[in-house]
């Protein structure tokens, strides 16, 4: 991990060189697309049962190699059912959702559950919130010179725990982000695209079981010929062909449309 005051995203390498990444200049007024990544490190065994920390505010130290210990604070959003060691976390000052094995990764130190709780807020427009889920959108970001830059993406779901936030991903950078999209919509920075396909979803027979790839191991071939492995950890309810993938060598949660072919 890097500290928020470390290198800008444009100065860091990405695990997957085949994807266009977020430029350091693509910033919103309130926050910015900041990301940190790292290679997989050693793990430490869990010696005793752990308390449920989902929904808790946490802080911990992070030490990478011979570098200094940096301090991180954030909110635990979820514990992944197919890999209970893995937690999804929204760190303060960063827009990506990160996946970490908080109790097993030896680079995590002094993990502390904070007494402050996540404030529960009422959604300002429940109908609009429901309407935008599963929709393609154009999301405007303000650059350093004050101009607007447009990012096409898809709203995936309401985020857990932080109930005024939404999961979203982008064509340019298919990792999992979260924003308060209702505010952006009302400010004119988010536009819902017309449906490109108005046909209704295929009807299911009563009792029909739909195959899911959740829990499956995956292998991804990069443009340089190397391969990376990971696990499918979540299926998007609004778009069942879309899944979250956690690769073994990366903290980001990737979002891919895995259309099953025969």
Curated annotation (Swiss-Prot):
Its biological purpose: May play a role in mitosis.
Tissue: Expressed predominantly in ovarian granulosa and thecal cell.
Superkingdom of this protein's organism: Eukaryota
Keyword Cell cycle appears in the UniProt entry: yes
Pfam family, one: Spin-Ssty
Region forming the signal peptide: none
Name listed for the protein in its UniProt record: Spindlin-W
Chain intervals with Basic residues compositional bias: 27-38
Annotated region described as Disordered, given as residue ranges: 1-49
GO annotation, biological process: gamete generation
Family: Belongs to the SPIN/STSY family.
Compartment annotation: Nucleus
Major location (coarse): nucleus
Entry GO terms, CC: nucleolus; PML body
Organism of this sequence: Gallus gallus (Chicken)
Protein keywords: Cell cycle, Nucleus
């Amino acid at each position: 991990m890097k500290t928020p005051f470390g290198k800008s995203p444009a100065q860091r390498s990405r695990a997957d060189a085949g994807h266009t990444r977020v430029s350091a200049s693509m910033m919103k007024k309130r926050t910015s697309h900041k990301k940190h990544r790292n290679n997989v490190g050693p793990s430490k065994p869990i010696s005793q049962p752990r308390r449920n920390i989902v929904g808790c505010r946490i802080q911990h130290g992070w030490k990478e190699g011979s570098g200094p210990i940096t301090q991180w604070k954030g909110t635990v959003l979820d514990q992944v059912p197919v890999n209970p060691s893995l937690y999804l976390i929204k760190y303060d000052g960063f827009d990506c959702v990160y996946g970490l094995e908080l109790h097993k990764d030896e680079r995590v130190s002094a993990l502390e559950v904070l007494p402050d709780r996540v404030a529960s807020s009422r959604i300002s427009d429940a109908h609009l919130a429901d309407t935008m889920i599963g929709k393609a959108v154009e999301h405007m970001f303000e650059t350093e010179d004050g101009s607007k830059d447009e990012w096409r993406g898809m709203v995936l779901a309401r985020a857990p725990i932080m109930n005024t936030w939404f999961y979203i991903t982008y064509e340019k950078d298919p990792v999992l982000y979260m924003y308060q999209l209702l505010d952006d919509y009302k400010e004119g920075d988010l536009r819902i695209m017309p449906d490109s396909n108005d046909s209704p979803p295929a009807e299911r027979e009563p009792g029909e079981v739909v195959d899911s790839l959740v829990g499956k191991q995956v292998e991804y071939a990069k443009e340089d010929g190397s391969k990376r492995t990971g696990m499918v950890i979540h299926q998007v309810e609004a778009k069942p062909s879309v899944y979250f993938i956690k690769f073994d060598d990366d903290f980001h949660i990737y979002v891919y449309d895995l259309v099953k072919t025969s």
